[in-house]
């Protein structure tokens, strides 16, 4: 699926006009079957009063800006002190030709300070939220963000699960996966066949009881607390015609 790209006002210089585009990498919109997260930049149509997206890729990128965002605790971490040095680094695989290299030879584009938010999430605050490329990137069609700290790459609990339904009991069976679900967590479920679909439930046990009849025995379950949304802002050069 696609990452959201929102066009903003471009500069008016004729020699080398600058375009600014906002890009939201939403973990629930990642490419199917891709792990770690991988996104294809595709245009969206008009949604209500909001125009989302005007082009299918970024071209002549000269600067990238990131804003604060939240992440769930990685599978390797259980406490805020587990983040070595209180830092997390973000690297984009497709932009590996231009990146910062640390003393251990690992590359990154952004460094973040880790701030605790809850027992399930932390906020990442950019130490320097701008990365300027030495040479313009001709085209960016895919983005694959990779997170790590000084101990190595970080893996996250799944935010989307394909689940199965017991047609006799109308219970959703949770697979044994890294979903990190606990009692009282809020989830969203798709796949109902019901005029007034109920999309949110709290899991009281390892099963989630379904009230309306189901469209099929295969449905999707979304876990908001595990969702990651990376807000990025790109500056590009557009050659005048």
Swiss-Prot record:
Q: Key word Cell cycle present in the record?
A: no
Q: Which GO terms describe its cellular component?
A: virion component
Keyword Oxidoreductase present in the record's keywords: the answer is no
- Keyword terms, alphabetized: Late protein, Virion
User: Can you say where in the cell this protein is located?
Assistant: Virion
Primary localisation category: virion
Report which superkingdom the organism of origin falls in.
Answer: Viruses
Expression induction or repression: Expressed in the late phase of the viral replicative cycle.
Family note: Belongs to the asfivirus H240R family.
Entry function:
Forms the penton at the fivefold vertices of the icosahedral capsid. Together with the minor capsid proteins (p17, p49, and M1249L), forms a complicated network immediately below the outer capsid shell, stabilizing the whole capsid.
Q: What is this protein called?
A: Penton protein H240R
Origin organism is African swine fever virus (isolate Tick/Malawi/Lil 20-1/1983)
């Amino acid at each position: 699926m696609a990452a959201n790209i929102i066009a903003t006002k471009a500069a008016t210089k004729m020699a080398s006009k600058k375009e600014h585009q906002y890009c939201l990498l939403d973990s629930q919109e990642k490419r199917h079957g891709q792990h770690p997260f991988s996104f294809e930049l595709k245009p969206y149509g008009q949604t209500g009063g909001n125009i989302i997206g005007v082009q299918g890729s970024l071209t002549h990128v000269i600067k990238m800006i990131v804003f604060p965002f939240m992440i769930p605790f990685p599978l390797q971490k259980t406490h805020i002190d587990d983040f070595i040095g209180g830092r997390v680094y973000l690297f984009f695989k497709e932009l590996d030709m231009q990146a910062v290299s640390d003393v251990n030879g690992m590359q990154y584009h952004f460094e973040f300070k880790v701030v605790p938010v809850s027992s399930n999430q932390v906020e990442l605050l950019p130490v320097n939220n701008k990365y300027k490329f030495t040479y313009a990137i001709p085209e960016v069609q895919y983005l694959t963000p990779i997170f790590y700290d000084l101990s190595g790459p970080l893996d996250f609990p799944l935010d989307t699960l394909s689940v199965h339904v017991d047609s006799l009991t109308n219970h959703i069976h949770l697979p044994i996966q890294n979903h990190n679900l606990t009692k009282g967590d809020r989830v969203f479920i798709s796949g109902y066949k019901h005029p007034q679909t109920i999309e949110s439930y709290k899991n009281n046990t390892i099963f989630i009881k379904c009230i309306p009849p189901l469209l099929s025995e295969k449905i999707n379950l979304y876990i908001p607390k595990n969702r990651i949304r990376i807000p990025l802002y790109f500056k590009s050069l557009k050659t005048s015609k």
